[in-house]
Amino acid sequence: MQLCVALDLEKKEDNLSLLQELKGLDLWAKVGLRSFIRDGAVFLDEIRKIDENFKIFLDLKLYDIPYTMANAALECAKLDIDMLTVHLSSAKSALTALMQRLNALKKRPLIMGVSALTSFSEEEFLMVYNAPLKTQAIKLSAMGKESGIDGVVCSVFESLAIKEALGKDFLTLTPGIRLDQNDKEDQERVANAKEAKQNLSDFIVVGRPIYQAKEPREVVLELLKDC
């Protein structure tokens, strides 16, 4: 299991300062919409300057028509990133077009499809998708696998079921990781790192428990022990 550190702080300088504290550790730097829109592609180069071994996870959750998604993913791949997220709800035609475009490259990032955001409650998911969350997450994940993507973004609570249905080689990335399960904030389906490993998660995403800590490096070291 590998650790992705979410870089969601208010200022670019704060994100870079956090990474300076984590220099030398085996982790992924997760760049989401806020940081990428604000700081641009140059931010990725600044991450590499701190530690060239940091792997870069661009969490943009692409969702559009097939032509637009394929072109956007290609431009993201040109940034030499290691992982990119897309929405499974964009459907098989879009995912297939995207993978055909990326597979023509000598090197491409891992493509992870978002099944159900961890902010969804069961009731909210049912309202949007008119299906039980776990059932639909597996169905969307199966479509993603058929399209050729590498894995899915899901909660810890769907990870094991997806692995059992689609095979252990199909990757799962699980956000909503907390040190204390009572600390939900804006997430609904949260778990800790040990539970993520028990449910065969390949990647975990941790943000606030790290960057809100007095000693972020110590928190990361503890998390890495559980990985």
UniProtKB/Swiss-Prot annotation:
Pathway: Pyrimidine metabolism; UMP biosynthesis via de novo pathway; UMP from orotate: step 2/2. Keywords: Decarboxylase, Lyase, Pyrimidine biosynthesis. Homodimer. Catalyzes the decarboxylation of orotidine 5'-monophosphate (OMP) to uridine 5'-monophosphate (UMP). It comes from the Bacteria. HAMAP family: OMPdecase_type1_B (MF_01200_B). This is Orotidine 5'-phosphate decarboxylase. Belongs to the OMP decarboxylase family. Type 1 subfamily. It catalyses: orotidine 5'-phosphate + H(+) = UMP + CO2. GO terms for biological process: 'de novo' pyrimidine nucleobase biosynthetic process; 'de novo' UMP biosynthetic process. InterPro entries: Aldolase_TIM, OMPdecase, OMPdecase_AS, OMPdecase_bac, OMPdeCOase_dom, RibuloseP-bd_barrel. GO terms for molecular function: orotidine-5'-phosphate decarboxylase activity. Pfam families: OMPdecase (PF00215). The active site is at K61. One of its GO terms (cellular component) is cytosol. Its EC number is 4.1.1.23. PROSITE patterns: OMPDECASE. Substrate binds at residues 8, 30, 59-68, 118, 178, 187, 207-208.
